[in-house]
Amino acid sequence: MQQQGEPSVLSLRPGGGGGKSRLFVPRFSSSSSFDLTNGGSEETPFPVKRENSGERVRFSREEILQHRESVQVSDEILRRCKEIAVELFGEEQSWGNHAAESKITNHTQHRHTETDNRDWHSRSQIPTSGKEWLRDDPREAKSTWQGSGPTPVLIKAEVPWSAKRGALSDKDRVVKSVKGILNKLTPEKYELLKGQLIDAGITSADILKEVIQLIFENAILQPTFCEMYALLCFDINGQLPSFPSEEPGGKEITFKRVLLNNCQEAFEGAGKLKEEIRQMTNPDQEMERMDKEKMAKLRTLGNIRLIGELLKQKMVPEKIVHHIVQELLGDDTKACPAEGDVEALCQFFITIGKQLDDSPRSRGINDTYFGRLKELARHPQLELRLRFMVQNVVDLRANKWVPRREEVKAKKINEIHSEAERNLGMRPGAMASMRNNNNNRAAVSGAADGMGLGNILGRPGTGGMMPGMPGTRVMPMDEDGWEMARTRSMPRGNRQTVQQPRFQPPPAINKSLSVNSRLLPQGSGGLLNGGGRPSPLLQGNGSSSAPQASKPIPTVEKPQPRSQPQPQPQAAPLANSLNAGELERKTKSLLEEYFSIRLVDEALQCVEELKSPSYHPELVKETISLGLEKNPPLVEPIAKLLKHLISKNVLTSKDLGAGCLLYGSMLDDIGIDLPKAPNSFGEFLGELVSAKVLDFELVRDVLKKMEDEWFRKTVLNAVIKSVRECPSGQSVLDSQAVEVEACQSLL
């Protein structure tokens, strides 16, 4: 029971208020008056016992609805409820109205489907009494804000930003274009972007100076690319126009003169910048001083290297080089130069030392310079790090300017691949094959999975790319040319290459199984042998297997009679087949490399190294096949390569025609997997016919090799269309009208 003197406070939370650990709520009576705002009466309808003050007590809906009959609601609450009901349902409601209760129950279901046509802006304000309304209503706040007045007008800025405001001047347009070109400049894109830079629109001296400043800043801040930027300066020096001097009687403004002036100003301004850095002694300027020191060092070394690379391109005279060296060494032969000057001097000699030694006029002066460098290498006041740096330059000259480590410079992608192949011991062109032949490796992996081998055959190293990998084992061969596991009675030879394979294949491998040996990696036969049984899957695929074939090991399973002669293996056909396999592998490697770098001269050199004229028709067929498999088909690169090989007398027209016939005979099968192959093949033939390398007589022979009528029509239409697009195409069609009609008669 409640104690006397304690006022009863009603809380809307279940269990009432009071905050006591044990609270008994008296029952409501019908005669008691109840006012939510004044605290209500002393009786409540539900006695609830709360043992824990933090516990939340919940009532059911039926219990809460009992309040309606037992509570006397104040007039203020009834008025508020009516106003809310009018807002929600459009008519007056009461607590005792059961229709309103039904509307409240179904309001959630219909509120999204009903159309609200009421005027919310013109509704009357809710009158307030002396007692404040404690509930915050967001709808009320929103309507109050909306009815406060018109929306304030946005104030526009005097000079608003606009992406299209104003047109760029010619100077700004050219500078912006040159910035984009220099940001994309790489050794691979050099030729293309160089032409764009020349055609950028340099039509005045001011534009020329801005462009040179951009090139100069990019070069000195990227010392690794100084060689490329120096070559760019040399190439565009004669292509850009010169302009008259702004001063009367002055020299004309040329690219070379402005560039050398920039180099001179940067070299002479380094001293002023160092003096400014020395004056920054305030502790608060420590970070700024360190940043400026790094930037000054980077700009000095970059400028020195750029001047050296310009000397190699004959754009800087040697007298300027000697002046720079003498400035860096200083006039006092006994004094120690500054650390930054010594480091710049070493970088300068690494760049141009060989050129100075090769010049008869500069060789003697160079001896004097290096005599001074030898003294600096032993100078006690010089930092030990710089003494080692100077000694490395002296040793470099003694070694005929051949560095112990390769100099870091910008390289092309194919150069990086070649270097990786040399370092990893991979065959030439393996990197291009690994990058472009993902489909072939996936096929090999799938074949291996089907045999239960997992992905062991799909590894890049297993295919004989790297020497010493498991796929390069040399296994002995029996008289039939089958590989056998080595036994103790057999000579071991190289212990590293004939060790027993650790992998034991499943029993299904030793059963009758048909596997295409072209899909398996080179030298994979050693992985498939196990248990001393011969492997019927594939033979050795390397040049080292040929001597094994000439010395057969007699089988011991079934001895033969003495009267019957022992069959001797035919070594020559085996050698020829291995030679053909090796040629096919090298051909695919050189073609993949050509398709990635598009250098016909390198491809020409690789074809010449094959030294197999009889294989040239097959080479033409492989070129067409690999090129048309690409996406998109490489029609133009294929035609360009083959025309170049014919012009250099590496291929003959007969070889080219035979290769086209070989591919044409395969087109019925290829066209099923590559629907675009017939049209691409026709475009390729049209390129050669337009160049008068082939004629329509060969096209007719190629069409005869095809059985599919639709493929014939597609190829011929593509040939005629490609020839017509050539400037002299109509004359070619007129001169070979008879052959064209013969081709059309096959359709």
From Swiss-Prot:
SUPFAM superfamilies: ARM repeat. Residues 582-704 form the MI domain. InterPro entries: ARM-type_fold (IPR016024), Initiation_fac_eIF4g_MI (IPR003891), MIF4G-like_typ-3 (IPR003890). Residues 111-122, 132-142 have a biased composition (Basic and acidic residues). Plays a role in the accumulation of some potyvirus during viral infection. GO terms for molecular function: RNA binding; translation initiation factor activity. It comes from the Eukaryota. Residues 523-533 have a biased composition (Gly residues). Signal peptide: none annotated. Keywords: Initiation factor, Protein biosynthesis, Translation regulation. Belongs to the eukaryotic initiation factor 4G family. The lineage of its organism: Eukaryota, Viridiplantae, Streptophyta, Embryophyta, Tracheophyta. Gene3D superfamilies: 1.25.40.180. Residues 176-400 form the MIF4G domain. Residues 28-41 have a biased composition (Polar residues). Disruption phenotype: Displays no resistance to potyvirus. Possesses reduced amounts of chlorophyll a and b. I4g1 and i4g2 double mutants show reduced germination rates, slow growth rates, moderate chlorosis, late flowering, impaired fertility and reduced long term seed viability. They also exhibit altered responses to dehydration, salinity, and heat stress. The i4g1 and i4g2 double mutant has reduced amounts of chlorophyll a and b. EIF4F is a multi-subunit complex, the composition of which varies with external and internal environmental conditions. It is composed of at least EIF4A, EIF4E and EIF4G. In higher plants two isoforms of EIF4F have been identified, named isoform EIF4F and isoform EIF(iso)4F. Isoform EIF4F has subunits p220 and p26, whereas isoform EIF(iso)4F has subunits p82 and p28. This is Eukaryotic translation initiation factor isoform 4G-2. One of its GO terms (biological process) is regulation of translation. Residues 1-54, 105-149, 489-580 are annotated as: Disordered.
